[in-house]
Regions:
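Conserved acetyl-CoA-binding loop of GNAT-fold acetyltransferases
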Residues: 125-135
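Conserved acetyl-CoA-binding loop-helix of GNAT-fold acetyltransferases
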Residues: 87-100, 123-127
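Terminal substrate-recognition subdomain of acyl/acetyltransferases
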Residues: 138-150
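Conserved hydrophobic beta-strand within the GNAT/NAT acetyltransferase core sheet
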Residues: 76-79, 109-113
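Conserved beta-strand-loop-alpha-helix junction that forms the acyl-donor binding cleft
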Residues: 110-122, 138-140
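Active-site acidic-Proline motif in GNAT/NAT acetyltransferases
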Residues: 82-88, 117
Length: 150
């Protein structure tokens, strides 16, 4: 029986976050590509130090998935699961945590991702109640989700 836990990431987890991010097959980015996009260890360190914004899922104490929010923008900025840990409920757990935090201060939250049909994450987000509201470019789409009524 595997033991699953969810916790806030600390600066000590930065290397693990990059390892998880570069492990994915779909929407893959190398360290060099992330660097070119401004996604660097320094940027993650600043984000973590500004306030809790990254949830880390661990299986048997090993970091295997994470979600990250941009609180000011009301955006789920990232959600990645190591391929060998997909379809175990970790993505849903991480999205629930990110959404709950964003819904504290936003009525409507967003995420941007590769919207091509072959990208499996689209079906995942749609099953969680996210709706495509805009095509941003040839690849990316913007999803939106509204705070549930009580």
């Amino acid at each position: 029986m595997m033991s699953v836990s969810l916790r806030m990431a600390t600066v000590d987890d930065i290397e693990s976050l990059f390892e998880i991010r570069t492990s994915v097959a779909q929407n893959h980015l190398s360290r060099k590509q992330m660097d070119e996009l401004g996604i660097t260890p320094q940027v993650l360190r600043s984000a973590i130090n500004e306030g809790p914004c990254i949830w880390l899922a661990e299986v048997d104490r090993q970091p295997v998935a994470f979600s990250m929010i941009d609180r000011a923008e009301g955006e789920v900025f990232a959600m990645f699961v190591r391929p060998e840990h997909e379809k175990c409920g970790l993505g849903r757990l991480l999205m629930d945590a990110a959404e709950a935090e964003l819904f504290k201060t936003h009525e409507r939250i967003v995420l941007v991702t590769d919207g091509r049909p072959e990208i499996r994450a689209n079906g995942f987000y749609q099953r969680l109640g996210w709706t495509v509201v805009e095509r941003i470019d040839a690849r990316d789409v913007r999803y939106e989700k509204r705070r549930p009524l009580l």
